[in-house]
Amino acid sequence: MYALRHLRLQSARHFRSSYAAAATTKHMLPRQPARVLIGDWSTWDKSRLQDVCSRSSSTATEPVKQQTPLQELVSAAKPYAQLMRIDRPIGTYLLFWPCAWSIALSADAGCWPDLTMLGLFGTGALIMRGAGCTINDLWDKDIDAKVERTRLRPLASGQISQFDAIVFLSAQLSLGLLVLVQLNWQSILLGASSLGLVITYPLMKRVTYWPQLVLGMAFNWGALLGWCATQGSVNLAACLPLYLSGVCWTIVYDTIYAHQDKLDDLQIGVKSTALRFGENTKVWLSGFTAAMLTGLSAAGWACDQTVPYYAAVGVVGAHLVQQIYSLNIDNPSDCAKKFISNHQVGLILFLGIVLGTLLKSDESKKQRQSSLTTSTASSYVPALPQKPEVLS
């Protein structure tokens, strides 16, 4: 009996050990590969766990965000805004100031300039400056692609096709015409006559070292147009020296601007006054500044301007002298900074014209006209009537 009982206990122990071995083989072995690959979780640090979580989340598919119609419109319009340089308004300011000078000079003594005309010319400057940039980029598409500063422009980089740019230019010119027809017929004809300069300017850098001269002739057309728009005709005694002063001013600031690209211009064969003047740039710019100040003084004398005007001319001269004296023609960032500061030149002169006109009275004009009349009358001596002979 004892032997039989012992045999049963041995059999039960053997069965339990066999079952445990089988269970271990069945349930524990599949976990081994994962344990081998991952390791003991208790030994992992926090950064390692975060790395695994980030990898697993990155594999999950995220839904693509859909743009709203307004966002799509903004994305589509962005290259065109860059084409017309909306993000760089300095060109619009430099185009507007000669117009504003002329409008302010044409105002009657003691009166403010015509605000409606200033608004129209400001709108026209924004539109036509953009049109000029579009024309420039159409001509210079291949050149811009080779210049570091301009290679990302919409046409040069292929964001806009040439056909799309031409369609956009047509819209710009149509808007410019819409502004122009708000003026009198003399101004419409005078304004339309400047379009030839706007179109041909980009070509000048291929044939002459003086493209800045042509740019000055186009950019300062408003010095003639502003007076014509308010008075119905152009007073050449005042407008011509003002126009020539603006041309000299443009040569100054655009030569500074051109020094940014002179190395690229040399490689691709583009001409500019920056290359023409070279190391003598400051001497040339000083000469054009002197000519500008002389023209402004002549325009002020023709308009019977007062002390604030001539004070503003003096401040403008000091500003330009400081620009030229401190200019580093081999530092593109300094050239860009000096170029942008010319917006202050235009504003200072405009404020001087406005203040000078407000302080101007009719007395000086009447005295001058009376002196001219007196001198003319004194130079004319009528012949005394002769007594007729009496025949006997």
UniProtKB/Swiss-Prot annotation:
HAMAP family: UbiA (MF_01635). Belongs to the UbiA prenyltransferase family. Its cofactor is Mg(2+). Pathway: Cofactor biosynthesis; ubiquinone biosynthesis. This is 4-hydroxybenzoate polyprenyltransferase, mitochondrial. Residues 1-22 form a transit peptide. Its EC number is 2.5.1.39. The keyword Phosphoprotein does not apply. Residues 365-392 are annotated as: Disordered. Disruption phenotype: Flies exhibit a G1/S block in the third larval instar with normal neuronal differentiation. It comes from Drosophila melanogaster (Fruit fly). It is found in: Mitochondrion inner membrane. GO terms for cellular component: mitochondrial inner membrane. InterPro entries: HB_polyprenyltransferase-like, Prenyltransferase, UbiA_prenyltransferase, UbiA_prenylTrfase_CS, UbiA_sf. Keywords: Isoprene biosynthesis, Membrane, Mitochondrion, Mitochondrion inner membrane, Transferase, Transit peptide, Transmembrane, Transmembrane helix, Ubiquinone biosynthesis. GO terms for molecular function: 4-hydroxybenzoate polyprenyltransferase activity. It catalyses: an all-trans-polyprenyl diphosphate + 4-hydroxybenzoate = a 4-hydroxy-3-(all-trans-polyprenyl)benzoate + diphosphate. It is a multi-pass membrane protein. Catalyzes the prenylation of para-hydroxybenzoate (PHB) with an all-trans polyprenyl group. Mediates the second step in the final reaction sequence of coenzyme Q (CoQ) biosynthesis, which is the condensation of the polyisoprenoid side chain with PHB, generating the first membrane-bound Q intermediate. GO terms for biological process: defense response to fungus; defense response to Gram-negative bacterium; defense response to Gram-positive bacterium; determination of adult lifespan; isoprenoid biosynthetic process; ubiquinone biosynthetic process. The chain crosses the membrane at residues 90-110, 115-135, 163-183, 184-204, 207-227, 236-256, 283-303, 307-327, 339-359. Residues 369-379 have a biased composition (Polar residues). PROSITE patterns: UBIA.
